[in-house]
Amino acid sequence: MMNNKLLLLVIALLCIASNSIVESFSFKVSAKVEECIYEEIGVDLSFTAMFQVIQGGFNDIDFTIISPDKRIVYSGQRESEGTKTLRSSFAGVYSFCFSNKMSSLTDKTVSFILSVGESSPIREIAKKKDLTPIERSIMTLSDGVIAVKNEQNYFKMREAAHRNTAESTNSRVLWWSVFEAFVLIALSIWQIYYLRRFFEVKRAV
């Protein structure tokens, strides 16, 4: 009996990595506009929302999480990035809103990752008051697996932001090089013209 129970716990732990919904978005929020992402989440599920402003102005934006009963469960102003983990009180559609209303001219590009956990036997074990040493170990490992998944998602988002920054820098360097080349060519043409005029005037004298 104990072996069967332990086997079930181990299988549940190994399946945690696949028993969650992970959605990733990159989108533009225009100036003076608010954009929202809607996700239906079941009752008593843990969900993690991660975002980063990867381009635009001072790379800041207002971020709000709204529950299905229209209650604001989190609100942050002028944030460049953030990670928020919550547990759903009841089932329904949650809203994740990004407001760029503070900006009158500049659009913002946002990278957003939403990870929603699924129910599993691990959750039922967590409700027990008295846990065996094996169950406590499984719970600790479960929390560790979830933390690693969230870190992977976070680094994926940061990698996208750094890639965007590198591409933007490369573009600026390219155009600056083109501008420098144009200036050098213009100066060379002017110097040739000036020297020719100088010697023509000197011969005439």
UniProtKB/Swiss-Prot annotation:
Cytoplasmic side: 194-205
N-terminal signal peptide: 1-24
Protein name: Transmembrane emp24 domain-containing protein A
Pfam families (UniProt xref): EMP24_GP25L
Organism of derivation: Dictyostelium discoideum
Topological domains annotated Lumenal: 25-172
Keyword Membrane: yes
Keywords carried by this UniProt record: Cytoplasmic vesicle, Membrane, Protein transport, Signal, Transmembrane, Transmembrane helix, Transport
Gene Ontology biological process terms, A to Z: endoplasmic reticulum to Golgi vesicle-mediated transport; Golgi organization; intracellular protein transport
Annotated membrane topology: Single-pass type I membrane protein
Domain of life: Eukaryota
High-level lineage: Eukaryota, Amoebozoa, Evosea, Eumycetozoa, Dictyostelia
Occurrences of domain GOLD (ranges): 34-116
A single GO cellular-component term on record: Golgi apparatus
Location(s), subcellular: Cytoplasmic vesicle membrane
Underlying gene: empA
Role played: Could have a role in the budding of coatomer-coated and other species of coated vesicles.
Protein family: Belongs to the EMP24/GP25L family.
InterPro entries named among the record's database cross-references: Emp24-like, GOLD_dom, GOLD_dom_sf
Disulfide bonds: none
